[in-house]
Amino acid sequence: MKRLIILLFAIGITAMSSMSMAAMSNSRVRKETRFLTDKMAYELNLNTQQYNDVYEINFDFIYSIRYLMDDVIRGYEWALDDYYNYLDVRNDDLRWVLSDSQYRRFLGLDYFYRPIYANTGGWNFRVYITYTNHNHFYFPKPYHYRSYSGGHYRTHFHNVSYYRGRYNHSHYRGN
């Protein structure tokens, strides 16, 4: 009887952790990334190259924080620090892709600049507050929607932005 209870408990724990992990599968990361990037392209008037690069940057960010956010909600300080590090990398990479005027507009829109909000009930993307139709897209999928898997993240480039120097427009310099 004791073994049966322990076995059922172990199965229950495994099922709950699997459901938590399944909450942000790779396909969901791609879907969330596409939705956020599509709205950024629409509001910031991105060209095709920018659209594809912003998709990569958003993918890297969402992929990196997808399981971390549960620990942020639990109140772990290390998780919050990690979250803000990932957010800083994302926003700095975007600085190299967006023009000065696009980046200034980006800074003024919380649902782009700080795309995730958390409360005691969980976490979600701010963009869904403004854009309530989750199935409406202004643009087709990025050309590498199914194939991109993080190859341009900073750890692959000695912690230097892959996007630095790829564009010839003026960049936001913080002034």
Language model features with spans:
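Low-complexity segments
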Residues: 26-38, 42, 49-175
